[in-house]
Amino acid sequence: MTIVDVAKNLNLSIATISRAINGTGKIKEETKKRVLDYVKEVGYTPNAIAINLSKQKTRNIAILVPNITNSFFSNLVNEICKTFNKKKYNVMLYNTSESRDLEREAIRNIAAQRVNFVIAILVKSNYTNNPLKRLQSLGVNCILLDRDVENYTFNGVFLDNYSGSYEITKRLLEEGHKNIGIITGESTITSSNERLKGYKDAFKDCGLNIDENNIFKGKFNIETGEKAVEYFKNRNITALYSVNNQILLGVLKKSLEINKHLRLACFEEDDVIRALGIDVLACKIPVDEISEVLLQSLEEIKDGKTYIKPILIK
């Protein structure tokens, strides 16, 4: 039996169970007694690592990032480090390279260390057994960032992917573009699906039909952008919308002068592309606001708040 099972059987949060067992934090005496009586009855023995984490509070935070070469993620991590370092937190970075195997390995490493908080941008959104549940069972607090997950409830800070994508597409339509190609990422990632839905709904709300042949589905990587350029070569599109900057880099790698023929758009603004003077319609992601909201969420969890309603950054 794990602490997750105890929490589920008593219909309480993992954090509440942990506080009752370890005698830390604020908890009602009747709740504490109920927990202690139950664990004694079933013979539950807390994991030694979890006890160590609860009694030896650290200021160690781990960040899981799926692709540090993505300028959005690197800028975001840089801002998070600056924000948290000011508060004397130690930040450890794990780059999972969009690999579930590397993600599992990173989580195993985190579980073996004295880490109290994990900020996770997971590789996928659909898991049969979410790896973060392992960390929660050890008393590690987890906050999802950017990508939500299905069938699990975690604290989280997310971008408004739908609205941003809707506004980009609407702007292109207002500029007179009706034949707009879109390059999306994996359907197993919520942000990709939300951005595609924003694109489709913008067409619908403008009374226009969607040409499914103008949707190229791939991955959040440069290769997808390169393949998409070949795909759209004879599609007579006038605008091309990449749902992340890695895809856009692939588009430009295939044809650096493509912007002379097509109106380019990207969900995430890229500093390098902007510095090169390439005109791209894009959302400016408020990484400073995201890092401050993450810090605020972490402080609330430290103060005993076990669940924070997911926060949407517009």
Describe the role of every protein-language-model region.
Residues 56-170, 230-234:
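Alpha-helical recognition/docking segments in bacterial nutrient-uptake
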Residues 66-75, 93-102, 147, 156-167, ...:
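Hinge/beta->alpha junction and helix N-cap segments in small-molecule ligand-binding domains
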Residues 86-87, 138, 203-210, 235-236, ...:
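Short helix-capping segments at alpha-helix termini
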Residues 230-314:
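Flexible loop/turn connectors
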Residues 16, 53-69, 179-185:
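Short beta-strand segments enriched in small/hydrophobic residues
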Residues 1-58:
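N-terminal helix-turn-helix DNA-binding module of bacterial transcription factors
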